[in-house]
Amino acid sequence: MPDTRFHKRAGPFTLAEVMAICDAAVADTFEGALDQQFSDVAPLDQAGEGQISFLDNRKYVGQFRETKAAACLVHPDYADQAPEGVIALISEKPYRAYAKLAQAFYPEAEGSRVVAATAVVADSAELDPSVSVGDYAVIGAGVKIGADTII
């Protein structure tokens, strides 16, 4: 999970929205849960209430069977092994689906520069418009800082 001090989390997303983002399906038993909301993504062994995880490697089937995630993106071969109460989001490519979902929860920041009031930036420094400079940082003369850098 990204550090929320640096990355803003979007959402929550409903099950219907998650299915659309990931191009995933659910078993008929969960069709009535399309309005259920999810707040984040997390690894199998760390996921909890309101969170979605994924299984893409049979090495982690044990963690999948024990997960406390609210839902889990899985290949159809593993869907029937989901723990009771865990929604199996069925995808032929669960890792790719999880990546899409993580991008939805943690979208790229819009390219707006943020420089803390306590930061010192030399007049000759060149900062990309997407750079963020935190409290008490010092950017010296002639320094060039590229896109999406957080200091």
Regions found by a protein language model. Give the residues of each.
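Terminal amphipathic alpha-helical/low-complexity segments used for targeting or macromolecular assembly
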Residues: M1-T118
